[in-house]
């Protein structure tokens, strides 16, 4: 590696809009994010599942298609 070519790698603080803060390594000192693992529905278990069977049946009825 060449000297003085690469940016300085330091500890960075990640701040989420929900208030959670994390420390990671980065070339920036601070970053702000809209969503993190503390507030994302997938990680919190509050996710919703979409019922696709009803949509498929509606499509088949609309266009007269059989299963």
Swiss-Prot record:
Necessary cofactors: Zn(2+)
Statement: the UniProt record of this protein carries the keyword Calcium: no
GO cellular component, one term: ribosome
Matches recorded under InterPro entries: Ribosomal_bL28/bL31-like_sf, Ribosomal_bL31, Ribosomal_bL31_A, Ribosomal_bL31_sf
SUPFAM superfamilies: L28p-like (SSF143800)
PANTHER family per record: 50S RIBOSOMAL PROTEIN L31, CHLOROPLASTIC, LARGE RIBOSOMAL SUBUNIT PROTEIN BL31C
Family matches, as HAMAP family: Ribosomal_bL31_1
Subunit note: Part of the 50S ribosomal subunit.
Function description: Binds the 23S rRNA.
Protein name (record): Large ribosomal subunit protein bL31
């Amino acid at each position: 590696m060449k000297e003085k070519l690469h940016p300085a790698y330091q500890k960075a603080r990640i701040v989420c809009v929900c208030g959670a803060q994390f420390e990671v390594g980065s070339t920036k000192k601070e970053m702000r994010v809209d969503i993190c693992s503390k507030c994302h529905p997938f990680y919190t278990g509050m996710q919703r599942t979409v019922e696709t069977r009803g949509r498929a049946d509606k499509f088949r009825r609309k266009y007269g298609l059989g299963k």
